[in-house]
Amino acid sequence: MAREKFERNKPHVNIGTIGHVDHGKTTLTAAITSVLAKKGQAKVQDYAEIDGAPEERERGITINTAHVEYETDGRHYAHVDCPGHADYVKNMITGAAQMDGAILVCAATDGPMAQTKEHILLAKQVGVPALVVALNKCDMVDDEEIIELVEMEIRELLSSYDFPGDDIPIVQVSGLKAIEGEAEWEAKIDELMEAVDASIPEPEREIEKPFLMAVEDVFSITGRGTVATGRIERGKVKKGEEIEIVGIRDSRKTTVTGVEMFRKDLDEGLAGDNCGLLLRGIEKEDIERGMVLVKPGSITPHTKFEGQVYVLKKEEGGRHTPFFAGYRPQFYIRTTDVTGQITAFTAEDGSNVEMVMPGDNIKMTGELICPVAIEQGMRFAIREGGRTIGAGVVSKIIE
């Protein structure tokens, strides 16, 4: 049978459920599909289907993730849900499932727990822009006062991690009762989705951002000049435009004298295109893999940053032994390995850590030996002798 065509008539937003184990993330995800399916906006997926998510590999790291899609009146959503806590950590850090916003699921019976906090911190560190709270299992709490207290606690917690705790919508739901078809709880799922529609902003499309292309390869074409090839990460570029070459050495400006794709000339290259840019007055030696071509002034190179890092377990092909501050691995940034040093670590509770074990999720400070174009929210890998031993995301630029 012919495959269904993906209709692009509604804006597309990526979201996911986050929160403590057993607070009902997967049940809520199933409830959203069952309620929306009644309006023809989703395909029903039950708990077992979502929970039995297949393993995926992202940069050599095994992650279990369920992908569910549905739509509301105004939007099309791709929703990710992970069975295990470690899967969330890996997912959010590697950006395997990029989230434009998240539904934080918290059980009214328990209130915020350890992983509730950890997921809020992760969301902050990896740059999830907006959250909506689903206060789940509200059918099991008769006392309105308890619910109010839990809501206050969640708001305080969100504010302590620099989310707008007072303004984030908290919707009282019961995933289980909604799946069982109880009308009042089905209506609550609709209310939750209205809150998601209203509070999670539509992501800026890649093509509207300033131009950036990481250089993968460089050729010189006799009589025409030097061509840098790569995939345009964002924005667009036209023949005749001025661009800047940033990273590794001093930044310099040049003009694009041609855009080529599959050996044909293009008027302009767009985000997602693999293409070659012909650069005026640039020798092959002036440019190398790891540099980026950008809209002038839109990005500056840096050497020092903070990152949230997941260190691979030995079963995932990571190290077998711990490492300490002063450790010098390679940081694989966009298209190249750059040597650097990890100067300090901090645990989730903010305490200093002397030693990092395989399987840990930590905040670290890294320093590179040469400046490269790094920016907040950017993903990187930590490698040693060509194998990946960690995955990270830049949470803050220091210098």
Swiss-Prot record:
Binding site for Mg(2+): 26
Protein name, UniProt field: Elongation factor Tu
InterPro entries for the chain: EF-Tu_GTP-bd, EF-Tu_GTPase, EFTu-like_2, EFTU_2, G_TR_CS, P-loop_NTPase, Small_GTP-bd, T_Tr_GTP-bd_dom
HAMAP family: EF_Tu_B (MF_00118_B)
Region annotation (G2) ranges: 60-64
GO terms for cellular component: cytosol
Domain of life: Bacteria
Gene this chain is encoded by: tuf
NCBIfam families: EF-Tu, PRK00049.1, PRK12735.1, PRK12736.1, small_GTP
